């Protein structure tokens, strides 16, 4: 499986390294970078993005880093610098804004898992034509899991002994939907670019 963009590697490594540093220093950086409704209302809008890069503890960071690295490995033929940074910025912003405007009772939030769902959904949609059966199956599993997380009685505390907090399932929903929007947006832009290139070549 050939990488789509070999120059993505240092960009990917930069994000991973940033998460490791922030994860190791979570006790110091979380008060400044985590989702904090009161602080956001006072103008600290960067928290809508940076909240996805910080974590509750080292285990929380490692779990999400493992997911990110696996996505980077399995979808190396689909990701390039534009798509990667579009995911981080677009899904980060959309998920952060959704948490702020839709979950008005939410006061604090940290973690990559929400937008990690967005990356996974985006890559599965982007690569669907190459392996439709497998990608459809995984998308159905993700959709089923998200639906189950939204059901009353779902145990949001199942990872508390590891991550020192509950799983905030709405972030998974918002992140996955952001991934769908990202796929639509990038597909539209790339299709438009190809059409313009084709029209130019025919002239």
What kind of region is each of these model predictions?
Residues 96-101, 123, 143, 180-184:
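Alpha-helical transmembrane segments of multipass membrane proteins
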Residues 64-69, 116-122, 172-186:
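Hydrophobic cores of alpha-helical transmembrane segments in multi-pass inner/ER membrane proteins
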Residues 140-187:
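Terminal transmembrane helical module of multi-pass membrane proteins
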Residues 1-46, 71, 78, 89, ...:
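N-terminal signal-anchor transmembrane helix
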Residues 23-27, 75, 100-103, 147-153, ...:
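Transmembrane helix-loop junctions and nearby membrane-interface residues
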Residues 14-86, 90-96, 101-109, 161-171:
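N-terminal TM1-TM2 helical hairpin plus the immediately adjacent luminal interfacial "cap"
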Residues 49, 93, 118-123, 140-148:
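Small-residue-rich segments of transmembrane alpha-helices in multi-pass membrane proteins
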Residues 105-138:
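A contiguous pocket-lining binding segment that forms or flanks enzyme active sites
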């Amino acid at each position: 499986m050939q990488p789509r963009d070999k120059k993505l590697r240092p960009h990917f490594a930069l994000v991973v390294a940033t998460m490791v540093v922030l994860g190791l220093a979570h006790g110091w950086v979380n008060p400044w970078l985590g989702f904090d409704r009161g602080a956001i209302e006072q103008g600290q809008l960067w928290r809508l993005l940076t909240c996805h890069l910080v974590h509750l503890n080292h285990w929380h960071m490692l779990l999400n880093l493992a997911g990110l690295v696996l996505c980077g490995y399995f979808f190396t033929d689909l990701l390039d610098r534009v798509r990667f940074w579009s995911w981080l910025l677009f899904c980060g912003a959309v998920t952060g804004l959704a948490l702020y405007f839709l979950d008005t009772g939410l006061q604090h939030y940290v973690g990559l898992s929400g937008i990690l769902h967005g990356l996974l959904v985006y890559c599965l949609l982007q690569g669907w034509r190459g392996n439709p059966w497998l990608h459809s199956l995984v998308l159905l599993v993700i959709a089923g899991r998200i639906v189950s997380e939204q059901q009353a009685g779902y145990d949001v505390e199942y990872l508390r002994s590891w991550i020192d907090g509950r799983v905030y399932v709405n972030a998974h929903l918002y992140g996955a939907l952001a991934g769908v929007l990202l796929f639509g947006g990038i597909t539209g832009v790339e299709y438009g670019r190809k059409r313009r290139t084709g029209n130019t070549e025919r002239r």
